Amino acid sequence: KPKISMNILLLGSGGRECALAWKMSQSKKLSKLFIGPGNGGTAAYGTNVALKPTDFAAVSEFVVANAIDMVVVGNEDPLVAGIYDYFKSVDALKDVLVVGPSKAGAMLEGSKDFAKEFMLRHGIPTARHLSVNSENIAAGEAFLESLKAPYVLKADGLAAGKGVLILDSLDEAKSELRLMLDG
């Protein structure tokens, strides 16, 4: 039988978490809302708590101590680190609902290279790409030369939505590629 009211822990500290906290706070099914670590905006909708979302031991202690029914993972870092899998592997946490994918599923967000290979493997339309590292910069530059502007460079891994450069100049794209890989 579903619970009539729930204690929820929302993990994260950005604007996304503020929007989620605002909407969750309107639910009649919400008993208590905690946001870890939260921000100034989230404090208006629940209780901010000093939690680092990737510190699974501290998060799990808080969940048990506060009878949390659901954990909503707002940002990508704990998902890529495997928080869903962690909760499902600990007996005291198995029944806690975790909103977010497993570590394997989070790779679609956590690695642009993995996501591109996944799309190709499954016939999902996507733009042409080449994965470049410091050992094949020349191949990366040659690939850029085969394209027309705009040139799109993406860093692999999490970048908080800021890992993409869109450039109109081939020379600038080559320069930025070298900067991304050589520092």
Predicted region positions:
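ATP-binding N-terminal substructure of ATP-dependent carboxylate-amine bond-forming enzymes
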Residues: I4-P101
